[in-house]
Swiss-Prot record:
It is found in: Plastid, Chloroplast thylakoid membrane. Keywords: Chloroplast, Cytochrome c-type biogenesis, Membrane, Plastid, Thylakoid, Transmembrane, Transmembrane helix. One of its GO terms (cellular component) is plasma membrane. May interact with Ccs1. The chain crosses the membrane at residues 17-37, 41-61, 68-88, 143-163, 227-247, 260-277, 288-308. Belongs to the CcmF/CycK/Ccl1/NrfE/CcsA family. One of its GO terms (molecular function) is heme binding. The gene is ccsA. This is Cytochrome c biogenesis protein CcsA. Required during biogenesis of c-type cytochromes (cytochrome c6 and cytochrome f) at the step of heme attachment. GO terms for biological process: cytochrome complex assembly. It comes from Piper cenocladum. It comes from the Eukaryota.
Amino acid sequence: MISIALEHVLTHISFSIISIVISVHLIKFLVPEIIGLCDSLEKGIITTSFCITGLLIIRWVYSRHLPLSNLYESLMFLSWGFSTIHIFSKIWNHQNDLSTITATGAIYCQAFATSGILNEMHQSAILVPALQSQWLMMHVSMMLLSYGALLCGSLLSVSLLVITFRKNIEILEKMNQFSFLIESFLLSEVRPLKKKKSFLQNISFLSFKNYHKYQFTQQLDHWSYRIINLGFTLLTIGILSGAVWANEAWGSYWNWDPKETWAFITWTIFATYLHTRTNQRMPGMHSAIVASIGFLIIWICYFGVNLLGIGLHSYGAFTSN
C-alpha cells in the first residue's frame, strides 16, 4: 500500500511540475525579456524526469517486472523518454531548441496516462505467459524510446515546413513591395539623401533577418536528421529483438498482425526519409514532408492496436483482456 501511495504522489508531482513548465515556457515565449525563466524551465524538466524515474522503479520493484505491460505504463515510460531527450539535447546543444517539443510531449503523455480512460491499468497486474520473458525489457524499451525520438524529430521537420512555408510567403510579399518601391523610385523625382539611406537600411535589415531565419531552419533540419537517425536505429533494434522474441514465444519471426504491419510501415517511411535526406539531388523539403507523414504513422502504430484491441500485440488495450 505504501508503494501504491508513493506512486500516486510521484505521478501527481511530476504532472504538476510539467504543467508549470509548459506555462513558464509559454510566458517565456510571449515575454522573451524575462531571462530568469530559462533556469526554472530546465530545473522543472529535470525534476519531472527524476519523479517519473522513481515512479517506474517503484512500480518495477512492486510488480517484479519491467513496467511496460500496458498502455498506462508505456505512456509514462514515453513521457520519461521525452524528458530524457530534453536533458541530453540540453547537454549537446546549450540553446536547446527541442524544449517546446519535449516538454509538450511529456505533458500530453502524462495527461492521457493519468486520465480516467486508463484507470483500470493504474494497478499492476501479473503478466500473461507470452510476456514473461527477458526480451520484454529489450524489445518494448527500444520501441518506446524510438517512438519518442522519432516523434521529436518529426515535429522538428513539421516546424521546418511551417517556417519555410511562411518564409516563402514573406519573400513573395517583400518582392512585391520591392518592385513597387523600384517603380515608385523610377517614376518619381529624386528624393532626399536621408530617404535613400533609410531605404538601404531597411534592405540590410531584411537581409540580416532572412539570414537568421536561414540559420534557424538549417539547425532544425540538422537536429531533425540526427534525432530521427537515432530513433530509426532504436526502432530497428526493437523490431529485430521483437522478431527473436516472437520466434521463441509463437514459433514464427513475423506474423503480420496489425502492430507488426504498422511497425514495418513506420520503418519504411523513416528509411525513405534517411534516403531522401542524404540524397544531394533532393532538397531538404522532400525529406521534411516524408518525416511529417511519419509523425502520423507513429501514432497509428502506437495507438492503433490499442484502439482495435486485436492481434498478438493487444495486451494492455482499452478493452480488458
